[in-house]
Amino acid sequence: RSISDPNPFLISNIRGTFTLLETVKTTKKRFIQISTDEVYGSLKDQSADESFRFNPSSPYAATKAAAEHLVNSYVLTYDCDCIITRCTNNYGPRQFPEKLIPKTILLAKQNKKIPVYGDGKNIRDWLFVDDHCDAILQALLNGKTGESYNISAGNEVDNLTIVNKILSIMDKPSDLIEFVEDRPGHD
């Protein structure tokens, strides 16, 4: 969505973070910035630790990186108690329907073609939403001011494998898969 219309992401991720930080500056409450591993960009065969250089490849990822820099500036300038978490791909109940897993399920139920970007070999680490929430709570309770924490599940699977597993579970044919041109900014 950020590729076709980045403005809402600029407003929520940068302006929204600024608004929250201004409140934190006066209340001195702990603030946790929920970010994304997308700030690192395409890692190919590498993994990133928290000190890895940012290289966002989409407007969404760039706004999350900008928000992180804003958070860090409030830690240094105003002595705010802030921490940052960067998670991998979440999945679970009430996920946006345009995301890979729910979209695949919805289209397969309707026996419609399922678009898979490129060759489908983009690897993602899949993190169940409840596990992500547990990790956020641990970071909030135990994290150090000014630190960033990567959150992953160690469950790396390429997109094509995910789609094929869903089709198999649903007893649907693999010819529902339609390979489409990779979208710009896809990491």
Q: Positions of the model-derived regions?
A:
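Residue-level signal for the nucleotide or nucleotide-sugar donor/cofactor binding architecture
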Residues: 4, 12-15, 51, 58, ...
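Short, glycine/charged-enriched secondary-structure capping and boundary segments
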Residues: 3-8, 45-49, 97-105, 130-131, ...
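Active-site proximal helix/loop that lines the substrate pocket
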Residues: 1, 36-39, 89-95, 121, ...
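N-terminal Rossmann-like NAD(P)+-binding domain of SDR-like oxidoreductases, especially those catalyzing
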Residues: 1-90, 168
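C-terminal substrate-binding subdomain of Rossmann-fold SDR/epimerase-dehydratase oxidoreductases
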Residues: 102, 108-187
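Active-site phosphate/pyrophosphate-handling residues
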Residues: 15-19, 66-69, 99, 103, ...
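Gly/Ser/Thr-rich beta-alpha loop segments that engage phosphate groups in nucleotides
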Residues: 18, 43, 63, 94, ...
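Conserved helix-to-beta-strand junction in the class I
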Residues: 23, 27, 107, 142
